[in-house]
C-alpha cells in the first residue's frame, strides 16, 4: 500500500523521470494517462545510451536506433522535397512553354504561307516541317547540329526557289546540287540566313541548357537528400533523439547546439557539395540573364515566319541577278524539251508582303506566361536555393520536432542528461573553421 501511494504521488507531481512499459514508451505515450510503470534497471546492457539507471532494454535501444534513422531521413527529406518540387514545377512550366512556343511558331508559319503562297507552299511544306522537327529534336536532347540544320534548310529552299523562278529550264539533281553549294556566296536570301542562324543557335543552346539545368537540379536534390547515416552517425542520432526516453525524459528535446553539432557530422557530405552547388546556381542565373536578353528564344521564334518570308521576297526581287551568277558558275541549263508558257512571278504566289513584326508584341502561350516572367520567377527560386546544403543542419534543427530551439536551452537534452548546454559549446562552434566538421558525438 505505501508503494502504491508513493507511485500515485509520483504520477501526480512529477512524471518526467518515470519509465513506461516497453510498447508504450516506443509510441511515446504519457505515463500518467495510463498508469503504467516500468522497473528501473541498471544500464550495463546499453551500447549507446548512458549506462546509469534506465528503463530501456537492449531491444528497445535497437528499436530506437532504427526510429532515429527514420526520423533523420524524414527531416532531411521534408526540407529537400520542397526545393525539389520547386525545381520540378519550374522545369515542367518551362518545358511546356518552350514546346508550345515551337508548335505555335510552326502553325503560324504554316497558316501564313498557305494564305500567301497557296499550292506552291503546300507542295514544299515538307521542307519547313523538317526544319521544325529538327529544332524540336535538338531541344529534347537529340544529336542535332543547329548550324548544319539551318544551312541545309536554306540550301534546299534555294533549290526549290531557283526552279520556281526559272520554270523554262530543266535542272538535273547534279545541277541543283551545284546551286545549293554556292548558297553562302550567292546570298540569294540577303542577310536573313546569317542573322537567323546566329539568333536561333544561341537562343536554342541557352533554352536547352536552362531546361536541362532545372531537371539536373531536381535530380541532384533527390539523390543527395537520400541520406543513409554511417554506424557512427546512427549512434549519434540515437543518443540525441531517443536516449532521453531511456531516462524517462520523453518530453525533453535535444538542445539546439547539440542537434546542430550532430547534424553537421551526419550531413558532412552534403555540406561539402555546397561549393559546387552554389557554382551551379550562379551558372544557371547567368543563363537566365541571357534568356532575358539577346538569347530570348521567344523573340527569335515568334517572328520566324516573317523573317523566312522576307528572305523569300529578297530571292524573288533578285532572282535575275542570282540566276545569272548560278548560270555563270554552274553552266547554262537546258531548256524544257516541250515549251510551256512561263508563269509570271506574281502568279507564282511570291508577291505578297506582310506587316513588319513589332518586338513590343509579346504574346503569351497557353502555358500562361511570357518567357520574361517565367525566367524572372525561376531566378528568384535559384537565389533562394543558394547555400541550401550548408544550411541544412541548422534548418533541420530549427524544426521543433528535432530540437528545443536556440532560445530554450534551460530544459533540453545534452546527450547525457537534462541540462543547459551552456555558452562554452556555442563559443566552440562559432570558432569552428568552415572546412571542419565537428564530431557527431556530443
Question: Where in this protein do the model-derived segments appear?
Answer:
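Eukaryotic terminal intrinsically disordered regions
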Residues: 2-69, 76, 275-442
Amino acid at each position: 500500500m505505501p508503494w502504491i501511494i508513493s507511485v500515485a504521488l509520483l504520477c501526480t507531481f512529477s512524471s518526467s523521470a518515470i519509465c513506461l512499459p516497453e510498447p508504450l514508451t516506443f509510441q511515446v505515450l504519457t505515463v500518467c494517462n495510463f498508469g503504467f510503470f516500468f522497473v528501473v534497471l541498471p544500464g550495463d546492457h546499453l551500447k549507446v545510451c548512458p549506462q546509469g539507471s534506465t528503463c530501456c532494454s537492449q531491444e528497445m535501444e535497437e528499436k530506437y536506433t532504427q526510429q532515429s534513422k527514420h526520423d533523420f531521413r524524414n527531416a532531411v527529406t521534408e526540407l529537400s522535397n520542397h526545393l525539389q518540387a520547386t525545381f520540378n514545377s519550374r522545369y515542367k512550366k518551362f518545358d511546356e512553354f518552350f514546346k508550345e512556343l515551337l508548335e505555335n511558331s510552326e502553325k503560324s508559319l504554316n497558316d501564313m504561307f498557305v494564305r500567301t503562297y497557296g499550292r506552291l507552299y503546300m507542295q514544299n511544306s515538307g521542307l519547313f516541317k523538317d526544319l521544325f522537327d529538327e529544332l524540336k529534336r535538338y531541344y529534347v536532347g537529340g544529336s542535332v547540329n543547329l548550324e548544319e540544320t539551318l544551312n541545309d534548310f536554306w540550301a534546299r529552299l534555294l533549290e526549290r526557289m531557283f526552279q520556281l523562278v526559272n520554270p523554262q529550264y530543266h535542272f538535273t539533281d547534279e545541277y541543283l546540287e551545284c546551286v545549293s553549294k554556292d548558297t553562302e556566296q550567292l546570298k540569294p536570301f540577303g542577310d536573313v540566313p546569317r542573322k537567323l542562324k546566329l539568333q536561333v543557335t544561341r537562343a536554342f543552346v541557352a533554352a536547352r541548357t536552362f531546361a536541362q539545368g532545372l531537371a539536373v537540379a531536381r535530380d541532384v536534390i533527390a539523390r543527395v537528400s537520400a541520406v543513409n547515416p554511417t554506424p557512427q552517425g546512427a549512434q549519434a542520432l540515437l543518443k540525441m533523439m531517443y536516449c532521453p526516453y531511456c531516462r524517462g525524459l520523453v518530453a525533453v528535446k535535444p538542445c539546439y547546439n547539440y542537434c546542430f553539432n550532430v547534424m553537421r557530422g551526419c550531413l558532412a557530405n552534403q555540406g561539402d557539395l555546397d561549393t559546387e552547388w552554389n557554382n551551379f546556381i550562379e551558372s544557371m542565373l547567368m543563363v537566365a540573364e541571357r534568356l532575358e536578353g539577346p538569347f530570348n528564344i521567344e523573340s527569335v521564334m515568334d517572328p520566324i515566319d516573317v523573317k523566312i518570308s522576307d528572305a523569300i521576297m529578297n530571292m524573288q526581287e533578285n532572282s535575275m541577278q542570282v540566276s545569272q551568277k548560278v548560270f555563270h558558275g554552274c553552266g547554262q541549263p537546258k531548256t524544257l524539251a516541250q515549251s510551256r508558257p512561263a508563269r509570271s512571278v506574281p502568279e507564282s504566289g511570291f508577291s505578297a508582303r506582310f506587316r513588319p513584326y513589332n518586338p513590343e508584341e509579346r504574346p503569351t502561350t497557353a502555358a500562361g506566361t511570357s518567357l520574361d516572367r517565367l525566367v524572372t520567377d525561376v531566378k528568384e527560386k535559384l537565389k533562394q536555393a543558394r547555400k541550401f546544403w550548408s544550411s541544412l543542419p541548422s534548418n533541420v534543427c530549427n524544426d521543433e520536432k528535432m530540437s528545443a530551439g536556440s532560445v530554450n536551452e534551460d530544459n533540453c537534452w545534452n546527450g547525457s542528461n537534462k541540462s543547459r548546454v551552456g555558452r562554452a559549446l556555442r563559443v566552440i562552434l562559432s570558432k569552428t573553421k568552415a572546412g571542419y566538421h565537428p564530431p557527431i558525438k556530443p
